[in-house]
Structures are given as structure tokens and as C-alpha cells.
Amino acid sequence: MIMTESREVIDLDPPAETSQEQEDLFIVKVEEEDCTWMQEYNPPTFETFYQRFRHFQYHEASGPREALSQLRVLCCEWLRPELHTKEQILELLVLEQFLTILPEEFQPWVREHHPESGEEAVAVIENIQRELEERRQQIVACPDVLPRKMAPPGAVQESCSPQPLTVDTQPEQAPQKPRLLEENALPVLQVPSLPLKDSQELTASLLSTGSQKLVKIEEVADVAVSFILEEWGHLDQSQKSLYRDDRKENYGSITSMGYESRDNMELIVKQISDDSESRWVAPEHTERSVPQDPDFAEVSDLKGMVQRWQVNPTVGKSRQNPSQKRDLDAITDISPKQSTHGERGHRCSDCGKFFLQASNFIQHRRIHTGEKPFKCGECGKSYNQRVHLTQHQRVHTGEKPYKCQVCGKAFRVSSHLVQHHSVHSGERPYGCNECGKNFGRHSHLIEHLKRHFREKSQRCSDKRSKNTKLSVKKKISEYSEADMELSGKTQRNVSQVQDFGEGCEFQGKLDRKQGIPMKEILGQPSSKRMNYSEVPYVHKKSSTGERPHKCNECGKSFIQSAHLIQHQRIHTGEKPFRCEECGKSYNQRVHLTQHQRVHTGEKPYTCPLCGKAFRVRSHLVQHQSVHSGERPFKCNECGKGFGRRSHLAGHLRLHSREKSHQCRECGEIFFQYVSLIEHQVLHMGQKNEKNGICEEAYSWNLTVIEDKKIELQEQPYQCDICGKAFGYSSDLIQHYRTHTAEKPYQCDICRENVGQCSHTKQHQKIYSSTKSHQCHECGRGFTLKSHLNQHQRIHTGEKPFQCKECGMNFSWSCSLFKHLRSHERTDPINTLSVEGSLL
């Protein structure tokens, strides 16, 4: 990028006055020389090869063929096809175009860092923007103080830019307001010498404040930072740091001359420079602007902000709104003692949290002050951060920009999409080390850990006296930030609260107003980016079991207000969540989500063993107990285990002799609801007998019983052949086998095929020696209860199967089928209808 060029003498005054005012002018003269020593000092880089290729001129070659050849060589030096792949070369071309379209104030700064990819360039720009935001908060006015020496020592070098450095001067002949010029006069920046090759030096003449030329205030920043990018790369880290600090001083001095923000907010901080011998008073009626110069790469960010500043005619206290004043006081009221390890930052006086950026500190302060400056124009709801307001406004607009690529479901917040991904993957990365239970969300794990915390704290308080202080020995295993890749299946294992111990000591007394921080429960992670220290405090109710939210209707209490709101919908009958497909409403959103899967056919929960899918996670959990044989719900009375909680609840009624289901016909009470339905079928048969119709077949008609049970449930699964509907897909699958005559289950003993798994178990009882069902009349035993029922008809003379053609009765259905064949020739259609009704 550094080429041999002829440098012209840079003169700041017209040529006619050069001989007379050599002592008064700011002159920089560099003779023509070969800059190969700079290449030795700074070896060619990727940016150097790129600049050689871009700035190659046609006249540098002897002819068109040589020019084309040199361009090819320069392009190969830049793109390096022998080392880079096609994708890498494309990335370099995209990077070159990206750097070209950047704003002028960003281009030199980004090229200084020599990014090798577009991502690196974007990262540099984001860092610049963050630094701009931080400096915008920190730039303040130093009242009436301007340092005499504003240039960093040993920082200015020779400028390789072909553009001359111009400094506007006021000719001595101009009579306009000489007094004002003297008031606006500033000492010209001292340019220290830097040793060059062959003992050449960069000389600079300084202007005096009396009869010599005066420099405008607006150009102080340009003169102070007249560095070119190549020169900046020659400085070491200490010189760069010194230059940055002094650049801030220069800019603070410019603002002290009367420049204020557009909002007329007066920013006050301590003086930057100790040199307070010379003071200048800001002009009373002056309006100036700082000119732009794209060559000043290092301070292009500050110059952009200087242009947005205006001179305030009345230098004094500016009007501020309360929120600006609070934010300003929070920034300025920071002492050096509040920094840690010499770092520059801001520490919160309320909670002690430390922030490096002022913008983050201001947002944090709003948590303590309760300020919510961002208000929704639709509903008037306020938020303390703009991003929260943006998310809330999507509720009114219906915008859902985050879409799942698997099922197409859209979300308003990106975190909701991340949580939704775990539904498809079935992943539960948050595990409890106490009981081994896994959770798909971190909030669910926290709620689960609170239960362990309450149990152990209650156990501890029972053993100790009331005067004993309660404490928790916290221990948490470190988990790294690398374990937190969402796209790579999050693998976080949050450690559990461990070792509560017999004796408990609490580090601070708990009163009703004081809470237990979450870091007392979970500890602190090792990663700075995963900062859970801002998790809200957990109220004392987490450890005492307090339920402050009480229902006025039934008196039931809840820990969280959201649970109370959901519970109150039971009393009010409110069902705000409605299905757009069928119009059915629900009182909870999760119920609506589960119902909508009936229409969409979505089954996101898949069993990894057999591949069976389910709409609800709880159904998958119940199904997995089939493979594992686990029966987690055990009866404390007899020790019997059950796979479902509802089965255990029905079993417990046997011990408590609780009979909650009563028949309205005869008043008989039953333990289970299915027993009540079976009993009501008997009453139906008795009523039909009074009408002269024998309906004894209804005494054990499972079809009627199932129809009774499904009356209160949905029946979304319908058979395409006969139109019959079912509440569960498994019932529909079994029903299809009646049409297809499929028998997938086989007996292991005789290899006979059956249509249902339950029929297989009944069939295998034939080969067993045990006959548990015994007739009380003759003592004969049977393996199946249905066989016993058929046998008992011999003793009772019961004939429940009747032919509708001739009225003849039979004890068994097989006898009726044989009889019906005699009517086939006369009326085969009626015979088929009778067979269908019996089936």
C-alpha cells in the first residue's frame, strides 16, 4: 500500500506571502525518498497487497500487455489462489465490496484492523458502535478550561496522504473583529519530532498568540489527530493508549468552549487536565461546525458526534427532564474507588454490581428507581428497556418474526423459539442432581429446586429450635459457556443445592421484607455472558411454603399470582383461548395448544424406543413406563405399584372405603366411575324389559360402556369406512383391524394370530393350569371370566340372544349364528343387518 511518491511542500498560506511569513506558518516539508524502510519496519500485509492491486495505474507499465500481466500478479498476491479455496476467494471479494460500501468514517478504522473475513469486519464495526455509544455518554463539558498542550508526545508522524493539511488562517489585513479572534485564539498544537531514516525529521513551526496567525476552534480536533492509517500502525500499544487519552482531552476541550447537545443537556464532570494556567472564555454569539475529513480515521467517530453539537448562546444551566438528570447523576457520581483492579466502569451504589459501559449501567439503575420511560402507544403499558417495548408491540401488530423450520410455528420472541426447539428434539438439558429429574426449561428447574429447598429447610427447622439461625451451604458445579450451544443441543447440567447439613447457619436474618437471592440457591456460573445474577429475588415464601395469593371463592392458596388467575377461571367459567378451527374454548393456553394438535395432526413427542408419537408430553412419560416396567406411584398401605397417578387414586379409595360415584336410580355407591357406568347399563336393560324387549345382552356390553365414557370427551378420530368416531387414535387403529382382518399379535404357544394384545393375554390363559374363575353351582373352573358367564347360563336357563325373524332365543351367540343361516336364503340382507347389530 505504501508506494514511492513525490511529496509536495504543504503550505498553509498563499504563495505570495510565503517568503515573508515563514516564521509564522505551520510548514511540513518532506523530500522525495524511497519508502522501502517502512516496508522493512512494517512487512506487507493482506491490506497492502489489496491496495497495490486497487491503486495500480496504467501509466506505471510500458504497455497494455505488461499492465495486464502486472495486474494478474498483483491479484494473485492479493487473493493467493494457491492457498485459498474458491469459497475463501469469494469471501475476500465480498469483504472488499463490504469495505467499499461502508461509511467513510468507518472505512479507515476497519481497514486498520485488517479483517480477513466479513464476520471480523462486522465485529470491528460493532465494537466501534459500542465505543461510540459509551463515549457519547461520557463526553462532558469541562467549564472554561482548555489545556495548553493538546497533542500526544511522540505520536505525530509523517503523513503519506496526498491531500494537504489545511488550516484556515485570518489575514492580518482583515479588520473584522480582531478582538474576537484573540478571544477565540488557541495555542497551536505542538508536533514533536519522530526520528526518520537518514536522520530526517518532521519539523513544525508553532504560531504565537500575539501577532501570528490564529487557528480556528473547530480545527483543533483536525490538527490534533492528523494521523494517517499507515502511521497509526507504527505506534506501539502505549503510544496508542496515550494518543486515545489525549484525543479525549482535545474533544473535551472543544466541548468546553460552549458546545452542547441538541437537547441542551448540560454535562458536568471533573477537569481532564491539571494544566489550568490558560483559560479561554466561550464566545457569546458564535455558531460553528466542525468540518469533516475522511483522512482522520482514528477520530472519525468523535468528529461525527462533534458535528451534531451546536454552540449554546447562553452558557449556563440547561433544562433537563428528571430521567436525564437521574441518568447523568448516576454516571457522574462515580469515584475511582468504585472501580475494580483499576478498570474504568460504573458500580451501582444499591446492589454493588459493576458495569463497564455506561448504557448498561443506566438500564440497570432503572431497576432500582422503577423508572419505565418506554411506553406503548396502544395500551399505555410501560417498560424500562426499549427491547421489551418492541417485543410487547408485536402483541398488537401480530408480528411473529421467529419461525420454526420444522413445524412452521412462529413466535414473537427468539427465546420462545429456542424453547420450542426442545419439543422436537425431546431434549431436557436441565437436570436435577438431587432426584435425577430433567427439565426442558431453566425456569422449570428453578421451580423444582425450590421444592427441594423448602423440604430441606423445613426438615432443618424441625430439628433446630426457633432461635437457631437458618442457613444454606451452597455448592454448585461450574459449567462452561461452551456447554450452552443451542444449535448443538444444549448440554447444561445445573448442579443442585447440596449438603444442607444437620446444623444450619444463615448469613443474614430473614425478615418479611428480605428475600433469598437466587445465587444463594444456584450459585454463580463461570461464564460472564451467562449471568444469572440478575434473576429476581425469591421471596421468603420459597422456604416457608407461604402461599400469599388466595382465592376468594374457595379459599385455595397459590404461590404465584399467575396460578391464581388461572384458577379463578374455573369459578368464572371464562375461556379466553378459542380454537379457530372448531370454535372450542379453553381456560388455559396450554390446553388450546394441545387441542390444536388434534386438527394439525402434530405429535411432537416421540418415543425413542418404539417410535410412537404423542401430542402431550405426559402421555409420552406414561408410555415410557411400558418399556421400563416402572411403576413409580406406589400405595403406602399395601405397597402395590401403578404406572399412572389416576390408577393409584382409584386404588386408595379401596383402603379408605371412599365411594364417590353414586347411582341416581338406586342410590348405590361405587369406587370407580367405570363401575358406575357398568351398573347403569343394568338399569337400561330393566327398562327395556318392561317394554317387552329383551335387552339382557346390554348387561355386559362394553360398547355401550365406552360410548358412555366418551360422551364427555372429544372424538376427533373418525373411521373413513363406517364413519365411527373415537376419542383416541389407538382405538381407531384397533377398529381398522375389523375392516382389514389384520391380526398382528401372535400366541407364543400355538402361534395363533389375534387382533388385539389384550386378546393374546386372554388366549394364553387357556394353556395355563390355573383356573381362577370357579362356578358356585357345580364347582367347575374356567380360565376366562367370559367362559364362566357362558357356563352359568346353563344353570340359570338364561338365553340372551334372540332372533328377530322368528323370536327364538339362544344361550350362546354361536348358536344364534347357526340359526340365522337358515334365514339366509329367504332374506339375506336382513340376516346381515342382524349379524352387524350383534357384532
UniProtKB/Swiss-Prot annotation:
There is a cross-link at residues 216, 248, 270, 303, 317, 509, 513, 709, 785 (Glycyl lysine isopeptide (Lys-Gly) (interchain with G-Cter in SUMO2)). GO terms for biological process: regulation of transcription by RNA polymerase II. Coiled coil: none annotated. Residues 218-291 form the KRAB domain. A zinc finger (C2H2-type) spans 346-368, 374-396, 402-424, 430-452, 549-571, 577-599, 605-627, 633-655, 661-683, 717-739, 745-763, 773-795, 801-823. It comes from the Eukaryota. Residues 151-175 are annotated as: Disordered. The modification Phosphoserine is found at residue 335. SMART domains: KRAB, SCAN, ZnF_C2H2. Residues 51-132 form the SCAN box domain. It is found in: Nucleus. Its main location: nucleus. Residues 158-173 have a biased composition (Polar residues). One of its GO terms (cellular component) is nucleus. Keywords: DNA-binding, Isopeptide bond, Metal-binding, Nucleus, Phosphoprotein, Repeat, Transcription, Transcription regulation, Ubl conjugation, Zinc, Zinc-finger. One of its GO terms (molecular function) is RNA polymerase II cis-regulatory region sequence-specific DNA binding. Belongs to the krueppel C2H2-type zinc-finger protein family. May be involved in transcriptional regulation. This is Zinc finger protein with KRAB and SCAN domains 5. It comes from Pan troglodytes. The lineage of its organism: Eukaryota, Metazoa, Chordata, Craniata, Vertebrata.
